[in-house]
Regions:
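Bacterial N-terminal signal peptides that target proteins for export
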Residues: 3-29
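Sec/Tat signal peptide C-region and signal peptidase I cleavage site
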Residues: 29-38
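Extreme N-terminal tail/first-helix region
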Residues: 37-49
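A short, Trp-centered hydrophobic/proline-enriched beta-strand micro-motif
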Residues: 48-67
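A generic structural motif
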Residues: 61-63, 85-87, 104-106, 151-153, ...
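An acidic-aromatic
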Residues: 73-125, 190
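Gly/Pro-enriched, hydrophobic low-complexity segments
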Residues: 132-134, 139-219
C-alpha cells in the first residue's frame, strides 16, 4: 500500500495524473504496430456502442507502466460525467463533471483540474469529440473484437487512447467497452480493464460531487 501512495505522491502535473487513471488492451493488440485499413462499418459500430452508453457502473483494475495494479469502481453518465473511486487506502479521487476532469488528492490536500477535451479521455467523454474522424482501426485477429485508436494529429499533447470493444449482446450496440489504453504526451502508458458492467442504472448527479480538501483560503 505504501508503494501505491508513493506512486500518487510523484504525480507532478495533470497529464501524469491522468495517465494513472485511464487505459487497457490485450498484449497482442498492444504489440501490433500496424494500422489496418478501417472498415467504416466497424468504426461506426464501435462509436454507436460508445454513444449508446447512457449510464455505466463497472469494476476496474488499473495497471501502470511498472506493472503495479490498483482496483476500484468506475461510474459514468452521459454527457461527460465520470467518477473513478479507488480502492480503500488510495487517497485519490478523479471526477469528470461534463466539462473538466478534477483530480483530488486527499492526502496532500491538492486539487488539479483540466478540460476533458485536453486528455485521452476526451474520446470517451467529450460529447463534441468526433471520434470517427480521428479513429483508426487496429488489427485484433478476432472478428468479435474491435480496437480503435483515437488521436488528434493537430493536438498530440492530448495523448492517444486505444479502446477495445468485444461482442456482447447485452451491451449498447451489441459491443461492450472491455478496456482501453491511454498514452500521454510523454509516452507514459496506463491500462484499465473493466468487468461487471451494469448499463442503464440510475445514477444521481450527486455521484459526481466531491469534497474539497483544501483550506478555504486556497480555493
Amino acid at each position: 500500500m505504501n508503494q501505491i501512495k508513493n506512486t500518487f505522491r510523484k504525480l507532478g502535473r495533470p497529464a501524469a495524473a491522468l495517465s494513472l487513471a485511464f487505459a487497457a488492451a490485450t498484449p497482442a493488440i498492444l504489440a501490433t504496430p500496424t494500422v489496418a485499413q478501417a472498415q467504416p462499418s466497424e468504426i461506426d459500430r464501435a462509436v454507436t456502442a460508445l454513444r449508446g452508453i447512457t449510464t455505466l457502473r463497472a469494476n476496474f483494475v488499473q495497471t501502470d507502466r511498472s506493472g503495479q495494479t490498483i482496483s476500484g469502481v468506475l461510474t459514468m453518465k452521459r454527457p461527460g460525467k465520470i467518477r473513478f473511486q479507488y480502492q480503500k487506502g488510495v487517497p485519490l479521487l478523479i471526477v469528470g463533471d461534463g466539462k473538466a476532469l478534477t483530480m483530488i488528492d486527499y492526502e496532500v490536500r491538492q486539487v488539479q483540474r483540466w478540460p476533458i477535451g485536453n486528455s485521452p479521455l476526451g474520446a470517451l467523454l467529450d460529447p463534441n469529440k468526433d471520434v470517427a474522424r480521428f479513429a483508426k482501426q487496429l488489427p485484433t485477429g478476432d472478428p468479435g473484437v474491435i480496437s480503435l485508436q483515437v488521436r488528434d494529429p493537430k493536438h498530440p499533447e492530448y495523448g492517444t487512447i486505444t479502446m477495445i470493444f468485444v461482442r456482447n449482446a447485452g451491451a449498447p450496440g451489441g459491443m461492450q467497452l472491455d478496456s482501453w489504453v491511454a498514452l500521454d504526451a510523454q509516452n507514459k502508458r496506463t491500462t484499465m480493464r473493466l468487468s461487471g458492467h451494469q448499463y442503464g442504472i440510475a445514477v444521481d448527479d450527486k455521484t459526481f460531487k466531491w469534497t474539497d480538501p483544501r483550506p478555504a483560503t486556497r480555493r
